[in-house]
């Protein structure tokens, strides 16, 4: 754990100087909603051994908080999030590209539980968002990302054999 750090794409949604009502209407499941330039620069700087200040995203308010989190560079940098392989400049910085493939039923159930419990959303709003933006954007952008992955992990992350292989690949890269 001391030799790794992680960085999530979800913290770099683009700044929105709009009202709450306007922010709620934004399609956050499209690659254009992320500040990919900022995220790519952060990854580049971490790989160069620099400490970075990462924004914190407030999902209940649909905007970045004023606070930031300091992230120290480590030997292993784990990136998580959608669209990581979509941007060539970012994708080129990733040594091992892992796509965790999860069944659609599991994805919607996880989203409902997370958004209702952690983000205070109504069930109706989560289902509407899933049908209007999440599912179509998944089919348009996320499914094609599988082709860019070095490793595809089936079973939504509950695949010990696949993760043992990933750990071995990381160890090999470090040596």
Regions found by a protein language model. Name each.
Residues 65-119:
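ATP-dependent NMP and nucleoside kinases share a basic, alpha-helical "lid"
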Residues 89, 99-100, 105, 121-131, ...:
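Anionic, Ser/Thr-rich low-complexity intrinsically disordered regions
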Residues 33-36, 40, 101, 120-123, ...:
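Amphipathic alpha-helical transducer elements in NTP-driven molecular machines
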Residues 2-13:
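Single conserved hydrophobic/aromatic residue that forms the stacking wall/gate
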Residues 11, 95, 150:
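Receiver (REC) domain switch/active-site residues of two-component response regulators
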Residues 56-65, 77-82, 132-136:
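Short gly/ser/thr-rich secondary-structure transition/capping motifs
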Residues 15-61:
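Conserved nucleotide-sensing/catalytic segment adjacent to the nucleotide-binding pocket
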Residues 72-73, 113, 135-175:
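NTP-dependent small-molecule kinase module
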